[in-house]
Amino acid sequence: MDIKIIKDKKNPLLNRRELDFIVKYEGSTPSRNDVRNKLAAMLNAPLELLVIQRIKTEYGMQESKGYAKLYEDADRMKQVEQEYVLKRNAVPGSETEGEEA
C-alpha cells in the first residue's frame, strides 16, 4: 500500500492540518485503520490526533482518494469533530469502540 499526499493545508482557526491523499494498493481495499496507521507513520504524528473523514474508491480501480485531518490537540478535536466520526476512527479494542449511545 502506497499513500501519496496531494494537498496539505494548514487551518490555524481549527488548529489542524487538512490532507487530501491517494492510496494505491493491490488486492482488496485496505481498512480505514490500516490507512490511518500508515498515514500517521508517514506524518510522524500521534495516531489519536489523526481523523480520516472519508475514503472513496472508484469501481474497478486499485486506488482510493481520501481526506484526513490532523489536530494539534485532542481537546480541539473533540470540540470540532462529530461524535460518529470519532467513533469511526476509534482504535480497535479501545473503550470507546462499541459503546451504546
From Swiss-Prot:
Q: Which UniProt keywords apply?
A: Ribonucleoprotein, Ribosomal protein
Swiss-Prot/TrEMBL GO biological process terms? translation
Pfam families recorded: Ribosomal_S24e
Task: Give the signal peptide, or none.
Answer: none
Transmembrane regions: none
Instruction: Quote a single Gene Ontology cellular component term.
Output: ribosome
GO MF annotation, one? structural constituent of ribosome
Origin superkingdom: Archaea
Q: Which family does it belong to?
A: Belongs to the eukaryotic ribosomal protein eS24 family.
Q: Which HAMAP family match?
A: Ribosomal_eS24
Instruction: Note the PANTHER family from the entry.
Output: 40S RIBOSOMAL PROTEIN S24
Designated name of the protein: Small ribosomal subunit protein eS24
Gene that specifies this protein = rps24e
